[in-house]
């Protein structure tokens, strides 16, 4: 595998060419996670006036795309090849790119951080090497195509660690040595592939103060350049019954505190509102006003806004899950007012 990585690196040094982006690195990111797009298109979903979805979003201001990567999902969607296909389209459209590496065969989140099937019998040292090789494999695949991602997440929503049970943590307890070791290994691998890439550690609940998490990460040698947060202010069932006003205010307070305490920028890596709630635009506008006033808040990505019309991915059917109800497109396949507000935001 090292020979492949060396070949790719030499090839890019010789050509020296990467896709150019519409907006400069480090500027305000107005983005969307569109990882379901290729599966939606495969299922025959069309967008407004048959316009390409990426171009549709670019036309109203999108300048960045976030794409997840699973190790080996049974359907093939969101695996490396699918991510690469979408990344090429996004790069051609002048988009800056964030890669969200889950280190799992399916969604990784605060309740699920399942070790990939192929890695199940690994000990800690072998797991570290698997994290390194998978990170390099994903990033060098992009490099070989002339794509230079601006950001990479080492794990997705990992307040409770990753690669469970080996890397599971519980507040200040649990397997912090292992979890922090995984993030440090992913960090070093990412910098090997792209020395100036911004490495993100991502947690959920933008409103929630978690001093114990970042102190433990630092104490055990975890590494990051930027903090990523998820924010779903209308999910009162997730948020202890808090109102959206409370959620937005608490998130703003926490973002400011994280920037001050850890001397690094913060990215809203995921945001979502209810698709059919007339309040959604008001909630988004309030949140955008708050975060654009924060100097070191780097941007915001809407999670899967392109979903509309009750579509759901194939893997949801056997699980008995309903369709995603926080898409931000109208019934005729056009970006809604919520997306207009997000994608026209400025700092």
Residue ranges and their predicted role:
Residues 14-16:
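C-terminal motif of bacterial Sec signal peptides marking the signal peptidase cleavage site
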Residues 42-46, 54, 257, 276-290, ...:
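Aromatic-rich peripheral "rim/lid" segments of glycoside hydrolase catalytic domains that contact
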Residues 39-48, 71-81, 159-162, 202-213, ...:
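Acidic-and-aromatic substrate-binding clefts and catalytic sites of carbohydrate-active enzymes
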Residues 56-175, 180-198, 204:
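Substrate-binding cleft and catalytic face of glycoside hydrolase catalytic domains
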Residues 30-34, 65-67, 97-101, 150-154, ...:
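Hydrophobic faces of well-ordered beta-strands that scaffold small-molecule active sites
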Residues 51-58, 195-198, 209-280, 292, ...:
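Glycoside hydrolase catalytic-domain groove-lining segments
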Residues 1-4:
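Positively charged n-region of N-terminal signal peptides that target proteins for export
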Residues 21-56:
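Boundary/entry segment of secreted carbohydrate-active catalytic domains
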């Amino acid at each position: 595998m090292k020979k492949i990585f060396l070949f790719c690196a030499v090839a890019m040094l010789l050509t020296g060419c990467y896709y150019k982006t519409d907006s400069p690195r480090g500027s305000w990111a107005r983005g969307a996670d569109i990882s379901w797009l290729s599966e939606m298109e495969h299922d025959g979903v069309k967008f407004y006036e048959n316009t390409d979805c990426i171009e549709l979003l670019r036309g109203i201001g999108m300048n960045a795309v976030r794409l997840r990567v699973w190790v080996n999902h049974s359907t093939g969607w969101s695996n490396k090849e699918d991510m690469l296909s979408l990344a090429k389209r996004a790069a051609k459209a002048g988009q800056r790119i964030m890669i969200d590496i889950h280190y799992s065969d399916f969604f990784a989140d605060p309740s699920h951080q399942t070790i990939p099937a192929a890695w199940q019998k690994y000990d800690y040292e072998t797991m570290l090497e698997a994290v390194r090789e998978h990170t390099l494999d994903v990033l060098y695949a992009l490099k070989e195509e002339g794509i230079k991602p601006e950001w990479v997440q080492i794990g997705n929503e990992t307040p409770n660690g990753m690669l469970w049970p080996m890397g599971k943590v519980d507040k200040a307890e649990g397997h912090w040595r292992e979890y922090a070791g995984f993030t440090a290994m992913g960090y070093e691998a990412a910098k090997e592939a792209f020395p100036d890439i911004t490495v993100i550690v991502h947690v959920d609940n933008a409103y929630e103060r978690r001093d114990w998490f970042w102190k433990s990460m630092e104490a055990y040698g975890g590494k990051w350049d930027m903090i990523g947060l998820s924010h779903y202010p209308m999910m009162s069932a997730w948020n202890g019954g808090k109102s959206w006003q409370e959620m937005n205010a608490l998130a703003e307070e926490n973002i400011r505190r994280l920037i001050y305490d850890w001397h690094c920028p913060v990215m809203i890596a995921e945001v979502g509102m209810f698709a059919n709630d007339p309040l959604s635009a008001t909630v988004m506008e309030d949140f955008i006003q708050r975060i654009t006033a924060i100097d070191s808040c780097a941007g915001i990505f809407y999670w899967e806004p392109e979903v509309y019309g009750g579509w759901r991915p194939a893997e949801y059917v056997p699980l008995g899950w309903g369709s995603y109800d926080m898409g931000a497109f109208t019934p005729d396949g056009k970006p809604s007012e919520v997306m207009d507000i997000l994608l026209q935001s400025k700092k």
